[in-house]
């Protein structure tokens, strides 16, 4: 984009502006948003000061940020995102927005140069005093001394929470001399101390808990945007007490009790850990002299104001909203007199003393003394939308008028295509810049702005893809911390005390933790399990692979089995029978599929390539991989049967569209089968739009078509005139004949009835089939079905999707009104989820009184199919603002303009349901909002509380997501295998079920379970060998290490575990050293055919297998073991060698030496 700034820099108008910008009060008029951004960016580039750009709201700040990222390095661009809604202060904060705010405040506190975009609400917000913020900036360096207690105390002030193992943002832990911290910005950090000196600082991976790279120094940023010290708490106690006493007599008696509950809920007087998320509501009482953000800026900062009049309008409504919000919470006993979140001074007063540059599109009167007014003439660019003739004549005009023409396109490929298009129009163009650019020609460069503009006095025109092709600008995202899929899904397997488990031999019990028991003078760790009644079972940790976490459908509480009863055996036998039946079916399907002959497609055609380049977005890596897998299938003679699995809105349709186009290019027909009329309409419109420039005949068969049109479509399918048909189950009727059907695409197959599914099966025989589903299919289950259906998964969301901002709040009409008003004010729509059909119309009336001007519709499952579809369609077409609905919206319908979801009684929903419902919003490049409301002052059940806690963590794809994934996976398994199996999965738990199914399938296919290469070794030594709680306090971490030790088969793995223990928990004690010695002995034994090593008090017995006995070279063994002298004796029992070792002082070392000698004495067998 340097060409743009170079052209602007040389212009006289800009030079006039540059002289007064930041020097005196100036009004700049006439510039469109993108032209304005170009000027501001150039001013910033030429100065050494901080530049503050004030906007009226966050939406405007986001838009300007996207354009500014084209000119300014992301490292120097900051935003202070505050929502235009008071309710935010009362709910769980979004970590994304909070980390952006902290990044901004930290940069300002350090005096960094940067361009800072702040919406009005952010400018007025009460903040931590600047000096206090500066005192809590910490930079740690290797070699420095720290006062550990003081340091940990500071972390707590900064909003960090102490845990035994760090797994989420905002946590820290202390183990021995190791401190782990997961800051909001940057990588998780591990600090190792030598007494009080920092010995090393390392990044570490939260998933594996292993260190990565050493760093010399690290900045620790706060984990909350408020600092709360002990002094702050004691000031707050006094202020809040006074506020409570002032408020109590002035409110209605009926709510005084509520006020008391609110006052006590902050737990200021009995707690030691303070939740910053909750205390932020009391910011007005926290500090003696709170700051606003302007006090964080340098005294010579440059200030630019975007659209002064808009800011004043927003300020007025903000003041009114804030006043009514505060009065509402006071009147309902939820707040106190004196509570506020913003400074009420006028916006001009806040920036007094600074020279300000005001940007306004139109000349306007302002109550401000201005020193200069600079007028620009700026015109919008004609919208071409691909109309070649208009484009040519406009470009010709620019050339004739000797303009500098800058064309911005978003990818390198498009640069080449644009140049080819301009050369066809005989417009001179270049793509590489050499120093300067002569006028009267076009330069095509990679880049994007929200819109083009023409500055006639400068002789400059900028044209973007928006004018050329109606493309939306792609969101430029600053790098955010991505959470890997493994991390999302891994930890639902984590065992917590109280979880249900399944023991392969004993059935369903409860996990009570790891206990160290003394058995015959030695200490060992056992897993303690509770069964029916008072039965308890202690499982040695080295047999832990027989215990799995019980995972089944959400809210299914399993029945505990009785130890020693026959009930579990019967249950397993039943499941075994059903699993074998399924295995039988799967094998038949598999054989059938292998035999079937289908059509073999050729490589991609030139049209295919052109068609794919036409896609206005970048494919995600998962999309690209899925497309390749599908094309590979189509290019084989065996018919494709592939399942494409991806969350709603993750781009499955584009993948399907490309497959459809490939089929049509080879003269084949495509049937696109969907479960509902509305979905049919949406897919039909997508196909029409995507294929408009290609000779493809697309038709729709659904209730929205007249009988005459349906008849014509059937005729067209029969003659081959129709290439692609989209439709509901009408496509499955017997009287439809295709001339040459090549591809069947089925969307959400599980939503079709049994009869329709049968019909789909018959169509499948020698046609390629692609099935799309938004319900995730568990990989473990899929593995056991390998070869029956192939699976492609799209797990990455498209580039420009924002995470949905999720709030968990008490039900309150003023919160609801504010959320509705905010969405409608940005011309959006709202889903209002109310799951009680009997009173849903009353709810609509209630909302209508709240929002008299809104159009409100109702949708629920008891309406006729036709009425429901009409309502949904009207909502999609923007005829209604608010849709009051039951969970009927959970699947399928795409309403990109609906970006707010409000759910009443969210505590009654399952997590997976909430997760899928939340996927309804945030579907466009706008931020989506989800409000989960629960009744005020209602005592929640434990499950509901856990669930809401998990939903709060949804805001960062935390554990809530994992639980939802788990439940959805089970739902997916049920869809794949049928309803009856769902019940069986619930009786034995998901993991055991998958394992049984896999074994049954393999057995039927004649695949023997691979005999373990190395036989099981039993090592039983009278030693204290375990992981003491003093060394590893966290039980999950302990189990994880035991699992690794159990799986160890090589010395490299042992070294790796030793490294991990030292890295995560510091030097290990003698009990752990012995445990590692035993594992080392076991590895030698595995490699040499030893089957048993048993401690019998004074001697140790070692047994070899017959095969190992045949392979051992006796001579080599006797030579090697001479140092052991008479302590070792050799014998033979049942053709197998036995060795006894008499115990002496260093007997453990002797045993290690002996097993090593045995391994080294093995002859390498000829078969190897």
UniProtKB/Swiss-Prot annotation:
Query: Any idea what job this protein has?
Result: Couples transcription and DNA repair by recognizing RNA polymerase (RNAP) stalled at DNA lesions. Mediates ATP-dependent release of RNAP and its truncated transcript from the DNA, and recruitment of nucleotide excision repair machinery to the damaged site.
Query: CDD domains in the record, alphabetically?
Result: DEXHc_TRCF (cd17991)
What organism does the record attribute this protein to? Staphylococcus aureus (strain NCTC 8325 / PS 47)
A single MF term (Gene Ontology)? DNA binding
Family statement drawn from the similarity comment of this UniProt entry: In the N-terminal section; belongs to the UvrB family.
Which residues belong to any copy of the Helicase ATP-binding domain?
A: 633-794
In Swiss-Prot or TrEMBL terms, this protein is called Transcription-repair-coupling factor
Binding site residues for ATP:
646-653
Q: Which HAMAP family match?
A: TRCF (MF_00969)
GO cellular component terms, A-Z: cytoplasm
């Amino acid at each position: 984009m340097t060409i743009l700034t170079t052209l602007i820099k040389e212009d006289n108008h800009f030079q006039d502006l540059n002289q007064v910008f930041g020097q005196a009060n100036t009004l700049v008029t006439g510039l469109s948003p993108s032209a304005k951004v170009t000027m501001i960016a150039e001013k910033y580039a030429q100065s050494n000061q901080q530049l503050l750009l004030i906007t009226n709201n966050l939406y405007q700040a986001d838009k300007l940020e996207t354009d500014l990222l084209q000119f300014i390095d992301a490292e120097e661009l900051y935003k202070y995102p505050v929502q235009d809604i008071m309710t935010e202060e009362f709910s769980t904060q979004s970590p994304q927005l909070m980390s952006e705010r902290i990044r901004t405040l930290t940069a300002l506190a350090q005096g960094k140069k940067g361009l800072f975009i702040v919406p009005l609400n952010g400018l007025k917000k009460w903040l931590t005093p600047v000096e206090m913020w500066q005192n809590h900036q910490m930079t740690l360096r290797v070699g420095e001394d720290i006062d550990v207690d003081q340091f940990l105390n500071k972390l707590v002030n900064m909003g960090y929470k102490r845990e035994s193992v760090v797994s989420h943002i905002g946590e820290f832990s202390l183990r021995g001399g190791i401190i782990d911290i997961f800051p909001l910005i940057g990588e998780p950090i591990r600090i190792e101390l030598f007494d009080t000196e920092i010995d090393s600082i390392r990044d570490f991976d939260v998933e594996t808990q292993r260190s990565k790279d050493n760093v010399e120094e690290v900045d620790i940023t706060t984990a909350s945007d408020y600092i709360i010290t002990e002094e702050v708490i004691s000031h707050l106690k006094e202020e809040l007490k006074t506020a409570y006493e002032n408020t109590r007599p002035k409110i209605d008696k009926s709510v005084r009790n509520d006020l008391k509950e609110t006052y006590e809920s902050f737990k200021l007087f009995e707690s030691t850990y303070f939740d910053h998320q909750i205390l932020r509501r009391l910011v007005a009482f926290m500090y003696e002299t709170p700051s606003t953000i302007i006090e964080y800026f340098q005294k010579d900062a440059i200030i630019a104001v975007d659209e002064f009049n808009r800011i004043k309008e927003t300020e007025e409504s903000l003041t009114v909203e804030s006043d009514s919000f505060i009065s509402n919470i006071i009147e309902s006993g939820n707040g106190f007199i004196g509570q506020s979140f913003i400074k009420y001074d006028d916006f001009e007063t806040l920036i007094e003393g600074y020279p300000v540059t005001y940007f306004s599109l139109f000349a306007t009167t302002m109550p401000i003394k201005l020193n200069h007014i600079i007028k620009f003439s700026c015109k919008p660019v004609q919208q071409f939308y691909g109309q070649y003739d208009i484009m040519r004549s406009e470009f010709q005009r620019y050339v004739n008028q000797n303009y500098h023409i800058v064309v911005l396109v978003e990818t390198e490929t498009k640069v080449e295509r644009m140049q080819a298009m301009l050369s066809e129009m005989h417009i001179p163009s270049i793509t590489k810049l050499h120093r300067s650019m002569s006028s009267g020609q076009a330069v095509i460069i990679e880049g994007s702005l929200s819109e083009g503009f023409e500055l006639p006095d400068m002789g400059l025109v900028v044209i973007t893809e928006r004018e050329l092709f109606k493309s939306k600008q792609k969101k430029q995202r600053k790098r955010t911390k991505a959470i890997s899929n493994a991390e999302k899904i891994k930890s639902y397997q984590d065992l917590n005390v109280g979880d249900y488990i399944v023991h392969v031999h004993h059935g369903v019990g409860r996990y009570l933790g790891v206990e160290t028991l003394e058995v015959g003078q030695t200490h060992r760790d056992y897993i303690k399990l509770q069964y029916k009644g008072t039965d308890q079972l202690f499982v040695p940790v080295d047999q832990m692979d027989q215990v799995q976490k019980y995972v089944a459908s959400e809210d299914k509480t399993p029945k505990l089995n009785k130890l020693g009863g026959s009930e579990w055996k019967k249950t397993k036998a039943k499941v075994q029978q059903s699993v074998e039946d399924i295995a039988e079916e799967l094998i038949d399907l598999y054989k059938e599929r292998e035999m079937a002959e289908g059509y073999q497609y050729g490589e991609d055609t030139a049209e295919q390539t052109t068609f794919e380049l036409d896609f206005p977005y970048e494919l995600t890596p998962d999309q690209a991989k899925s497309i390749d897998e599908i094309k590979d299938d189509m290019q084989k003679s065996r018919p494709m049967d592939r399942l494409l699995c991806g969350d709603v809105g993750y781009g499955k349709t584009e993948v399907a569209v490309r497959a459809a186009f490939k089929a049509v290019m080879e003269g084949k027909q495509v049937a696109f089968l969907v479960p509902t009329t509305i979905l049919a309409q949406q897919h039909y419109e997508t196909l029409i739009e995507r294929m408009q420039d290609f000779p493809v005949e697309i038709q729709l068969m659904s209730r929205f078509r007249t009988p005459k049109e349906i008849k014509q479509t059937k005729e067209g399918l029969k003659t081959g005139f129709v290439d692609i048909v989209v439709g509901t189950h009408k496509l499955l009727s017997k009287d439809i004949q295709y001339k040459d059907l090549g591809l069947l695409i089925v969307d959400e197959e599980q939503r079709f009835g049994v009869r329709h599914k049968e019909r789909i099966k018959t169509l499948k025989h020698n046609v390629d089939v692609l099935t799309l589903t938004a319900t995730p299919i568990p990989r473990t289950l899929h593995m056991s079905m390998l070869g029956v259906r192939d699976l492609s998964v799209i797990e990455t969301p498209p580039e420009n999707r924002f995470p949905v901002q999720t709030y968990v709040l008490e039900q309150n009409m003023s919160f609801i009104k504010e959320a509705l008003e905010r969405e409608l004010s940005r011309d959006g729509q709202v889903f209002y989820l109310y799951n009680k059909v009997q009173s849903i119309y009353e709810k609509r009336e209630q909302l209508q009184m709240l929002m008299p001007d809104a159009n409100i519709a109702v949708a629920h499952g008891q309406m006729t199919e036709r009425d429901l579809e009409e309502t949904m369609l009207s909502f999609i077409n923007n005829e209604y603002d608010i849709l009051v609905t039951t969970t009927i919206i959970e699947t399928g319908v795409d309403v990109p303009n609906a970006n707010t979801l409000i759910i009443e009684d969210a505590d009654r929903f399952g997590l997976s349901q909430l997760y899928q419902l939340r996927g309804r919003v945030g579907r466009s490049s706008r931020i989506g909002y989800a409000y989960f409301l629960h009744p005020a002052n209602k005592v929640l059940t434990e499950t509901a509380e856990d669930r809401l806690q998990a939903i709060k963590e949804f805001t960062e794809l935390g554990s809530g997501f994992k639980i939802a994934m788990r439940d959805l996976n089970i739902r997916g398994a049920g869809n794949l295998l049928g309803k009856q199996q769902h019940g069986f999965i619930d009786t034995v738990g998901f993991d055991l079920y998958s394992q049984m199914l896999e074994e049954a399938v393999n057995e039927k296919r004649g695949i023997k379970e691979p005999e373990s290469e190395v036989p099981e070794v039993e090592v039983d030594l009278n030693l204290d060998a375990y992981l003491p709680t003093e060394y590893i306090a966290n039980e999950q971490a302990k189990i994880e290490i035991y699992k690794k030790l159990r799986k160890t088969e090589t010395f490299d793995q042992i070294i790796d575990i030793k490294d991990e223990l030292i890295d995560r928990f510091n030097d290990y004690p003698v009990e752990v050293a012995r445990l590692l010695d035993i594992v080392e002995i076991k590895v030698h034994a595995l490699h040499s055919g030893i089957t048993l090593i048993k401690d019998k008090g004074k001697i140790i017995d070692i047994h070899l297998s017959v095969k190992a006995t045949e392979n051992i070279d006796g001579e080599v063994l006797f030579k090697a073991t001479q140092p052991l002298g008479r302590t070792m004796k050799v014998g033979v029992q049942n053709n197998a060698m036995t060795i006894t070792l008499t115990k002496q002082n260093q007997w453990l070392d002797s045993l290690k030496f002996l097993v090593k000698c045995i391994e080294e004495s093995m002859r390498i067998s000829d078969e190897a």
